[in-house]
Amino acid sequence: PPDISIFPQPGKLADSARDGFLVPLPDDVTAAVSQNWSDGAMGFGNVDGTQFGVPDKTDLKSLVWYQPARFEANGYTVPTTLDELFALTETMIADGNTPFCIGIESGTATGWTFTDWVEDMMLRRHSGDTYDAWTTGELPFASDEVSGVMQEVLDVWNTPGMVYAQGGSIASTSFRDNGE
């Protein structure tokens, strides 16, 4: 096996550690790396109190971009809650505007942006403990919480007038350039 592996999901790292496929990091490595990462970030590589990994990067996702000039021209107020956001989307559709541009095409990785939406919605609709139980496999995808959130995302995406998809459909539109 390799000396170093990159795990895109902390849950897979935890599973591999618990199954005995990983060795703990040396204390000096953990100490050195922890000087540059928060306890929360270090927690992604910590399994049951033992440090098996460290972050190698972070991604900033889950942002909603908007055009301030269009908001001003239409008299829209920037929402601060999810309920306000959905109320605004209804107003935008009634005004003939399309609230979202969404694309999930990403070659063999198509669909990861859907999971980002689901993760965001899980965190907004349920507790952090529920989210953690889901990401560690304790809460199955078939649970009411997870399946309900997935359905909510699909309902948003399938609302007539809600989504602009440059490629003709959300699945065939690249996540990279849908807003162009």
Question: Where are each of the predicted segments found?
Answer:
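Short helices/loops that flank or line small-molecule/ion binding pockets
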Residues: 1, 19, 70-71, 87-95, ...
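Periplasmic-binding protein-like
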Residues: 2-7, 101
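Hinge/lid segment of periplasmic solute-binding proteins
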Residues: 8-62, 86, 113
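Stable alpha-helical elements in mature extracytoplasmic
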Residues: 9-12, 21, 41, 67, ...
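Short helix-initiation/N-cap motifs at beta->coil->alpha
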Residues: 10-11, 82-86, 166-180
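Extracytoplasmic/periplasmic solute-binding protein
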Residues: 47, 52-56, 62, 86-142, ...
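Aromatic-glycine-rich donor-binding/catalytic loop that engages nucleotide-sugar donors
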Residues: 69-79
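Glycine-centered hinge/linker elements that transmit conformational signals in sensory
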Residues: 89, 135-171
